[in-house]
Design a protein with these regions (language model features):
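SMC-family hinge/dimerization module
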Residues: 196, 200-231, 241, 302-326
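Long, charged, glycine-rich C-terminal linkers/tails
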Residues: 183-200, 290-313, 371
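Short, small-residue-biased leader/transition segments that mark boundaries at the very start
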Residues: 1-8
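ATPase nucleotide-binding head domains, primarily ABC-like/P-loop NTPase cores
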Residues: 296-297, 304-404
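Non-transmembrane, heptad-repeat alpha-helical coiled-coil rod segments
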Residues: 248-282
């Protein structure tokens, strides 16, 4: 939070908009992968603590160096699991999708650790974060071997489930065998609408012509829209169908037991899982800062506390790099007031916005598009009053805006 009363006012908020920090943070957000990191990127605010700014710059430095060596780690499995874990801790049952999301987070945590451990080289400020990841392979494997997809629980999830499904297959084969004899029999050729085995309410039936209802004893489960076809469960298959329904009920109960057990396991590790989630989101944002630095061909500025700024070949980050004219700005040491004059559409506003935005960027922990030996100070407030709130992205000068 910026401490100055002036800087916490509407004027400061307006200055942030005028200097187009939100547009820059939108670009940063696009470099992040997880929704949480994207949201954090959009909410970044400049720090007024010089040590904090240097720490943030150290993080961006480390991420950019790692990206240069082996690319960014993947954060595609970083999904919000907080609500699901809170429900599991209350004794609730998580569904397969929620459990797979937790497993995906654990997989991502493990792979980020592997990324870090592959070639540690010299230590960085990110080491402590990488080292703190738990990477719970036990729970990850338990979930992924038990749940094949959002709609399918594996036979291997429990011996009981495998046994139930084996009996289910046997009962199903028995029912189909009985019905196959019926639809293959010449005796029922004129009785059946077609030689087909289908299901109604989970029970095997065959399509019987309505005017031949009495030819095949059994239970009617459905009637076609035209009324010409009855879907009949022959008496000979009732026992197999009953057995199948009982086994399906047992299967459902066993699946619920498995999901409850996996949910309880996840709840037992919730603290570590939530820690990993937060660390991964933080790393995602840090590597987004590194990626943005690469894209802008940016560099780390020297961080000062004396109120001076020294920019070498600075470029506005929202302008096309091929068209942007680099500028040098010195202020705060030999003199502390700088007046810029020049013709209309001559770049005065762009220069002022470049100065203000690059200072804001640095205090957000971002590298700035400027040359080596550039330096910025940590300010308690940066205020800007620029006519018409012209947009650099729209390349609209103050004079042109007035004419428009």
């Amino acid at each position: 939070d910026w401490s100055s009363d002036v800087c916490s006012s509407d004027l400061f908020e307006k200055s942030i908009r005028v200097l187009e920090l939100p547009q820059l943070l939108e670009r940063l957000s696009q470099k992040a992968v997880s929704e949480a990191a994207k949201e954090r990127a959009l909410r970044l605010t400049p720090s007024t603590d010089a040590d904090d700014v240097r720490r943030l710059q150290d993080e961006t430095d480390a991420a950019r160096a790692l990206i240069g060596l082996r690319g960014s780690p993947s954060f595609s499995g970083v999904k919000d699991v907080r609500e699901a874990l809170a429900r599991a801790e209350r004794g609730g049952m998580l569904n397969p999708r929620e459990l797979l999301t937790i497993a995906g987070l654990l997989t991502n945590s493990r792979r980020v650790r592997e990324y870090y451990e592959a070639d540690q080289g010299e230590g960085t400020v990110l080491d402590r974060m990488f080292d703190s990841l738990h990477a719970n392979r036990f729970l990850e494997d338990k979930i992924t071997t038990s749940i094949l997809s959002e709609d399918e629980i594996a036979d291997a999830a429990s011996p009981e489930l495998a046994d139930i499904r084996r009996h289910k297959r046997a009962a199903s084969a028995k029912g189909r065998q009985i019905l196959q004899k019926i639809i293959s029999s010449p005796s029922y050729k004129s009785t059946l609408q077609e030689a087909l085995i289908t299901q109604r309410d989970g029970r095997f039936v065959v399509p019987v012509k309505a005017d031949h209802r009495g030819d095949l004893p059994g239970l009617v489960h459905d009637i076609s829209a035209s009324g010409a076809t009855l879907f009949v469960e022959p008496m000979g298959v009732v026992q197999a169908n009953n057995e199948l329904k009982e086994l399906e009920a047992k299967e459902k109960k066993e699946i619920e037991r498995i999901l409850f057990a996996l949910s309880a396991e996840a709840a037992g590790f919730s603290e570590a899982i939530l820690w990993d989630y937060d660390i991964l989101v933080h790393l995602d944002l840090i590597f987004a800062r590194g990626e943005l630095s690469y894209q802008m061909d940016a560099a780390r500025p020297e961080i000062r506390t004396d109120g001076s700024v020294s920019l070498r070949r600075a470029r506005h980050p929202l302008l096309d790099p091929a068209k942007a004219v680099p500028i040098d700005i010195e202020v705060g040491r030999s003199f502390d007031t700088l007046v810029i004059t020049g013709p209309n559409t001559g770049g005065k506003t762009v220069s002022l916005k470049t100065l203000g935005l690059l200072c804001l960027m640095a205090q957000c922990g971002l590298h700035i598009p400027a040359g080596d030996r550039s330096a910025v100070s940590v300010f308690t407030g940066i205020l800007a009053d620029i006519g018409d709130e012209q947009s650099i992205e729209q390349s609209l000068s103050t004079f042109s805006a007035h004419m428009k």
